[in-house]
Amino acid sequence: MIISSSSDYREAARRRLPPFLFHYIDGGAYAEATLRRNVEDLSDLALRQRVLKSVGEVDLSTTLLKQQLSMPVGLAPVGLTGMYARRGEVQAAQAATQKGIPFTLSTVSVCSIEEVQSQVGKPIWFQLYVLKDRGFMKNALERAWAAGIRTLVFTVDMPVPGARYRDAHSGMSGPNAAFRRMVQAVLHPFWAYDVGLMGTPHDLGNVSAYRKEKTSLEDYVGWLGNNFDPSIGWKDLEWIREFWKGPMVIKGILDPEDARDAVRFGADGIIVSNHGGRQLDGVLSSARAMPAIADAVKGEMTLLADSGIRSGLDVVRMLAQGADGVLLGRAFVYALAAAGRAGVENLLDIIAKEMRVAMTLTGARAISDISRDSLVREIERPLARAAQ
């Protein structure tokens, strides 16, 4: 099929993947209202077109967390990425490194910290959950640092797992899940051979390294669910801040007061995120949450955002809302599932091209030129939708 956008990669991924995997990455929590709003609220932000501004050459480069990047984009941590392509985390990390942007490895990745970092020429980022098993957390931090990783992304919006109804219907969970997944794999032979057969082992590399035993998909759900810690507070994280000597970014902030708490805690940055609409349905989209957070803490830390970003236009919109950079989640996984490393590299080229067009037509020569003045304040469409 013809690929010209991230939506094309989504369709290609849908065709290639067994349903339990496609719907796991594609779905959200409960009725998926926040999942939809993440995309819709960004698209409702009208870019302010300017002409005859002598833009000339557009420069996408920027510096985030003292790292020089080709553009203000990174790849977000996504669990089980290695199930979407053969050794998927490695392929995605190689694509990101080739394009001069960071890749963030999930705690619950298929490929281990050591495997991924050894296959790329620059340090990746590592994401860690707040878990009851402090021994695992300490082990993961020590291994990440020893591997050369210096940027830690600490996810705080998962004290309990979100309810994702699609998973029960797709076969990721629910009655006879293992049998349903097996049947789906048989009906998708290209995936079954490339990933199912040639992409082994399919355990969770970081968890298995700590537990000293293979952690299967079935084990993953139980182990992770039993280890979430809803009792944790900022004071419980102080040992991590003391242990980790590199940049530390808090992921999962939607409220300005939580952003101020992150500043007081000593975080180097935050990620304005609702976990891609996969945790609490009905919360603000990242696009709507960003302006108030930027007003509260802009200049005191690095502001990143994820959730709902599908195009270079969305990147520019989120930067105009106050973000310093963004992370792509679903968009890169769709491309990875469809075409591996080459798909991710092509997606990033598409994103960069779309950014250049948007910046040229809004009169921005450099990332620093993007501001709230790059948007037309439009309220009619969001209000009209709310009234329906």
From Swiss-Prot:
Annotated positions binding substrate: 24, 129, 164, 278
CDD domains in alphabetical order: alpha_hydroxyacid_oxid_FMN
Catalytic activity from the UniProt record: (S)-lactate + A = pyruvate + AH2
Active site: 275 (proton acceptor)
GO CC annotations on file: plasma membrane
Essential cofactor(s): FMN
Pfam family of the protein (one): FMN_dh
Segments forming domain FMN hydroxy acid dehydrogenase: 1-380
Compartments, as annotated in UniProt: Cell inner membrane
Record key words, sorted: Cell inner membrane, Cell membrane, Flavoprotein, FMN, Membrane, Oxidoreductase
Stored Gene3D superfamilies: Aldolase class I
Cysteine-cysteine disulfides: none
Role this protein plays: Catalyzes the conversion of L-lactate to pyruvate. Is coupled to the respiratory chain.
NCBIfam families: L_lactate_LldD (NF033901), PRK11197.1 (NF008398)
PANTHER family: L-LACTATE DEHYDROGENASE (PTHR10578:SF85), S -2-HYDROXY-ACID OXIDASE-RELATED (PTHR10578)
Similarity comment text for this entry: Belongs to the FMN-dependent alpha-hydroxy acid dehydrogenase family.
Protein name: L-lactate dehydrogenase
Lineage, highest ranks first: Bacteria, Pseudomonadati, Pseudomonadota, Alphaproteobacteria, Hyphomicrobiales
